[in-house]
């Protein structure tokens, strides 16, 4: 399809950047004046239906004293410490730094809520964000220039998936309720339409891209999944789920491995080389509720799923059909809230997810804070909570940049950038 121009590409004048002047406090520091409203204690102690090996704890854990990383590395060099112990030491050190994370900058560029978020793969201070109105912002918060802003169509243009083009990071892939999955640049030019529904009743809800296999995969609201190459050639278009495909994920270490999540309460794992129809999946992972997301870990060995109620599950490659563990966590679905999705940390075995307090949740306390929760991916224990009393909304999307030292959060109309307090001082 011939390239065409998107309307109203501009430098936005609606960005509000807010450097933090006074130190915001952690949920634990707020407990005395909030009558200890933060979640405490353990969550449900029951085993999940499929005999998972552990059930995560709802309350934050007390971190052990941080060991010397230099000493641990020296012990490893001498053969006295295993590499997993080195990794554990690095993770423990990072968790201690999370206590000093504060909001570095804040932007409110959209007139509708943020719906998708993607970090630039090589620039650790650049993030792209899409909105319910189809607007897209490219924001380098490390410089004072105004972000680049691409105006959307408004109602019905929601950006449901956003990925930088791994072969040319001046371009990005986007799936939308407008009825297309497309490749475009940040000047507003549509370079190629990969999928188009040609009807207002069908739209695209999910997207993923693989640089090594040069594949693009996208899912729609009636259960179809389309696989294409980067030249736009359709390889297959099959109905893989009974209902909306909320998430598609290509395994980062095994290109032919695909996970799909749906509101039909299943996550399915596929071998792209053997897909013949909806019954040709390798594994079907049933859930109690519709599923918002299914994400592979950076090493490809684990799968993280988020339902629309109160469960986060971790599956392992050693046994895909049975969850390794279950984390009870309140993040229920609400029509006017961007679906909450848990995400992996890019370097450590940690899970980050926004909390939507639920009075019906077993461990809920009155006036529970809307925190960003960080869990250990091995044990399911909550390790840390981030909270700013001046930005106390629900953070639906939370993702660390590829370096793992900066967190971006989508909270309603706002985009929050979290980093160490010392980083703000240096700026």
UniProtKB/Swiss-Prot annotation:
Q: Which residues carry this modification: N6-acetyllysine?
A: 35, 77
| Sorted UniProt keywords | Acetylation, Chromosome, Disease variant, DNA damage, DNA repair, DNA-binding, Nucleus, Phosphoprotein, Repeat, Ubl conjugation, Ubl conjugation pathway, WD repeat, Xeroderma pigmentosum
Q: In which tissues is it expressed?
A: Ubiquitously expressed; with highest levels in corneal endothelium and lowest levels in brain. Isoform D1 is highly expressed in brain and heart. Isoform D2, isoform D3 and isoform D4 are weakly expressed.
Map out region (Required for interaction with DDB1) in residue numbers.
68-79, 87-98
Q: Region entry Disordered: which residue ranges?
A: 1-30
GO-annotated biological processes = cellular response to UV; DNA damage response; DNA repair; nucleotide-excision repair; protein autoubiquitination; protein polyubiquitination; pyrimidine dimer repair; response to UV
PANTHER family linked to this entry = DAMAGE-SPECIFIC DNA BINDING PROTEIN 2, DNA DAMAGE-BINDING PROTEIN 2
What protein name does the entry list?
DNA damage-binding protein 2
Q: Which organism is it from?
A: Homo sapiens
């Amino acid at each position: 399809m011939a390239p065409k121009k998107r309307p109203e590409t501009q430098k936005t004048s609606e960005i509000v950047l807010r450097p933090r002047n006074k130190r915001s406090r952690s949920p634990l520091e707020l407990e005395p004046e909030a009558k200890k409203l933060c979640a405490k204690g353990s969550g449900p102690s029951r085993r999940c239906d499929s005999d998972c090996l552990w059930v995560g704890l709802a309350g934050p854990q007390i971190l052990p004293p941080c060991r010397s990383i230099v000493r641990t590395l020296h012990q490893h060099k001498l053969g006295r410490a295993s590499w997993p112990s080195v990794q554990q030491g690095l993770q423990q050190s990072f968790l201690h730094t999370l206590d000093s994370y504060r909001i570095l900058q804040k932007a409110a560029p959209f007139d509708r809520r943020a719906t998708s978020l993607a970090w630039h793969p090589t620039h650790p201070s650049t993030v792209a964000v899409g909105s319910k109105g189809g607007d897209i912002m490219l924001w380098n918060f490390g410089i004072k220039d105004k972000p680049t802003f691409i105006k959307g169509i408004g109602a019905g243009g929601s950006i449901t998936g956003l990925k930088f083009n791994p072969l040319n990071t001046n371009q990005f892939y986007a799936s939308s309720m407008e009825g297309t999955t497309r490749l475009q640049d940040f000047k507003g030019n549509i370079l190629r339409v990969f999928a188009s529904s040609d009807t207002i009743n069908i739209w695209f809800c999910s997207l993923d891209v693989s640089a090594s296999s040069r594949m693009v995969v996208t899912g729609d609201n009636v259960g179809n999944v389309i696989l294409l190459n980067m030249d736009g050639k359709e390889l297959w278009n099959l109905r893989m789920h009974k209902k909306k495909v909320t998430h598609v994920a290509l395994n980062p270490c095994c290109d032919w491995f695909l996970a799909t999540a749906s509101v039909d309460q299943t996550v399915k794992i596929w071998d792209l080389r053997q897909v013949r129809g909806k019954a040709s999946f390798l594994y079907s992972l049933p859930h109690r509720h519709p599923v918002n997301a299914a994400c592979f870990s950076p090493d490809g060995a684990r799968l993280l799923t988020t339902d629309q109620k109160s469960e986060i599950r971790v599956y392992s490659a050693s046994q895909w059909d049975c969850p390794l563990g279950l984390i009870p966590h309140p993040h229920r679905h609400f029509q006017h809230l961007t679906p909450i999705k848990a995400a992996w940390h890019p370097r450590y075995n940690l899970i980050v997810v926004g909390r939507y307090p639920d009075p019906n949740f077993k461990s809920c306390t009155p006036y529970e804070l809307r925190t960003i929760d960080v869990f250990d991916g091995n044990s399911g224990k909550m390790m840390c909570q981030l909270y700013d009393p001046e930005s106390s909304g629900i953070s639906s999307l939370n993702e660390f940049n590829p370096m793992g030292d900066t967190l971006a959060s989508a909270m309603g109309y706002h985009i929050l950038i979290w980093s160490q307090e010392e980083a703000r001082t240096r700026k």
